[in-house]
Curated annotation (Swiss-Prot):
Residues 7-42, 45-77 form the EF-hand domain. This is Polcalcin Aln g 4. Pfam families: EF-hand_7 (PF13499). Keywords: Allergen, Calcium, Metal-binding, Repeat. Ca(2+) 2 binds at D55, D57, D59, E66.
Length: 85
């Protein structure tokens, strides 16, 4: 998207790679759960809810595009996450 700064794109890529533990180019529910545990305690229901919100095509994985779309819509949250990762 035209309003993304190159540094935002680089930050999204960096965070995505941290979440994508096995490096397959997509974030599974398990990987999301593990990453969210780093941020604090998280329940399986919270992970399911987050997956449902971010995984817009419903394939069970978060693609980089889906992650970027979520990051654009939640800039403040992503900035906070970037400080931790």
């Amino acid at each position: 998207m035209a309003d993304d700064h190159p540094q935002d794109q680089a930050e999204h890529e960096r965070i995505f790679k941290c979440f994508d533990a096995n490096g397959d180019g997509k974030i599974s529910a398990s990987e999301l759960g593990d990453a969210l545990k780093t941020l604090g305690s998280v329940t399986p229901d919270e992970v399911k809810h987050m997956m449902a919100e971010i995984d817009t095509d419903g394939d069970g994985f978060i693609s980089f595009q889906e992650f970027t779309n979520f990051a654009r819509a939640n800039r403040g949250l992503v900035k906070d996450v970037a400080k931790i990762f």
